[in-house]
From Swiss-Prot:
Residues 1-53 form a transit peptide. CDD domains: Era, KH-II_Era. Residues 172-175 are annotated as: G3. It is found in: Plastid, Chloroplast stroma, Chloroplast nucleoid. GO terms for biological process: ribosomal small subunit assembly; ribosome biogenesis; rRNA processing. Residues 266-268 are annotated as: G5. Nuclear genome-encoded probable GTPase involved in ribosome biogenesis in chloroplasts. Plays a role in 16S rRNA maturation in plastids and may contribute to the assembly of the small (30S) ribosomal subunit. Residues 151-155 are annotated as: G2. Pfam families: KH_2, MMR_HSR1. Disruption phenotype: Very pale yellow green leaf phenotype. Virescent leaf phenotype. The lineage of its organism: Eukaryota, Viridiplantae, Streptophyta, Embryophyta, Tracheophyta. This is GTPase ERA1, chloroplastic.
Length: 416
């Protein structure tokens, strides 16, 4: 399969109602995969509804009876259509394989700009410095989950920021850590290094509230080489939390003691300084056509983000080691035009005791988790869904390289 064509795997319906419903013509041998389209649709607002089944194998089963009856009727009325897409983190393609050529652009009514710029940007930094918040601001949509806990991001999340004159493709990477406790940690650092290998320039995000430190060691820990040979911008985040005088001192320190091209202070939470970052990136990106259609916000399909939403709710609801011991897999995603989409999710933990904590007394905790997840999933997809959640024990999954590769760490993500 040619890489340029691999980027075109989409099956448009059903899309978010306010977004483009244009379909790209595909060769007949391609397997369709719904790719997230559109921008500025946030998944943080909660709505009320129903449609959750929570069960842990051989441990807990709780079903809302009315909802089950409704779903059975819907199943009879409309047979389920199951899509099992391959979720890929595609490496940076050759520019001759860019997605849209001049003819295709004319067909789609989007003529190529003579000075159009496009390229890849790796976003690096230590855990909990605001990398994901920054990318969400730049893309205009919540793609990466955000919590107050470090090391929330595990995969290399791709976000696409497009305007008529440019296309910026951003890699949100896991936080760079010094000590790798599990095989999972080393696989996440592999994702960081692969992002650098695909990039045209690099953003290194630092916390303005913390004592300034040289980024050479961080680059060496995360990338394996402090001399990466790419333009580097140091993004000093959380400037809203310190006094202007302190910001000036830290800017001076970083400019003096770090080997970066520029330093820009921002507040990713409020979007302050984000336009300055875009301007800097565009000054470094080469001229070239868009790699993706302009209405696509990420190359990951919807089921990937469904799993991330559930994982975010685990981080919010549970404490200490529990969120870090969980792996969320979307086992089944069935799109049903005349009924609610059916989504089956499994949560893997490493110990029986952890499963008990996830479930809670009489299954109350897992039901709360599933309900919160469903509400955000419905808001994200802009449609009602029926969510089933299972909790299973998979001992030492964080040390199992075969499983980690299957779950998408250190390489491609494959649907289960």
């Amino acid at each position: 399969m040619e890489l340029g064509l691999a980027l075109r795997l989409v099956a448009p319906p059903p899309l978010l109602p306010c977004l483009s419903r244009r379909a790209l013509s595909l060769p007949p041998d391609f397997v369709s995969s719904r790719v997230l389209r559109g921008r500025r649709i946030h998944a943080s607002r909660l709505k009320h509804g129903a449609g959750v089944v929570c069960n842990a194998i051989m441990t807990y089963s709780g079903v809302e009876e009315e909802e089950m009856v409704e779903e059975e009727m819907e199943e009879e009325a409309e047979p389920a259509v199951s899509t099992r897409p391959r979720l890929e983190l595609i490496e940076k393609p050759d520019r001759s394989l860019a997605l849209l050529d001049e003819y295709e652009s004319e067909e789609l009514g989007t003529s190529l700009c003579a000075n159009h710029r496009s390229g890849y940007v790796a976003v690096l930094g230590k855990p909990n410095v605001g990398k994901s918040t920054l990318i969400n601001q730049m893309v205009g949509q919540k793609l990466s989950i955000v919590t107050d806990k470090p090391q929330t991001t595990r995969h290399r999340i791709l976000g696409i920021c497009s305007e008529p004159e440019y296309q910026i493709i951003l890699y949100d990477t896991p936080g760079v850590i010094k000590k790798e406790m599990h095989k999972l940690d080393s696989m996440m650092m592999k994702n960081v290094r692969s992002a650098i290998g695909s990039a045209d320039c690099v953003l290194v995000v630092a916390d303005a509230c913390k004592t300034p430190e040289k980024i050479d060691e961080m680059l060496e820990e995360g990338v394996g080489n402090k001399d990466i040979g790419l333009p580097v911008l140091l993004v000093l985040n959380k400037k809203d939390l310190i006094k202007p005088g302190e910001i000036a001192k830290k800017l001076e320190w970083y400019q003096k003691f770090t080997n970066v091209d520029d330093v820009i202070p921002i507040s990713a939470k409020f979007g302050h300084g984000v336009d300055d970052i875009k301007e800097w990136i565009l000054s470094k990106l080469p001229l070239g056509p868009a790699y993706y259609p302009k209405d696509i916000a990420s190359e990951h399909p919807e089921r990937f983000f469904v799993g991330e939403i559930v994982r975010e709710k685990i981080f919010v609801q549970y404490r200490q080691e529990i969120p870090y011991s969980c792996q969320v897999n979307v086992v089944s995603y069935k799109s049903r035009p005349a009924a609610k989409d059916f989504i089956q999710v499994e949560i893997l933990v490493e110990k029986e005791s952890q499963r008990g904590i996830i479930l809670g007394k009489d299954g109350k905790s897992i039901k709360m988790l599933a309900t919160a997840s469903r509400l955000d999933i419905e808001d994200f997809l802009q449609k009602k869904v029926y969510l089933e959640v299972e909790v299973k024990v998979k001992e030492n999954w964080r040390q199992d390289e075969r499983l980690l590769k299957r779950y998408g760490y250190g390489g491609e993500i494959q649907a289960l």
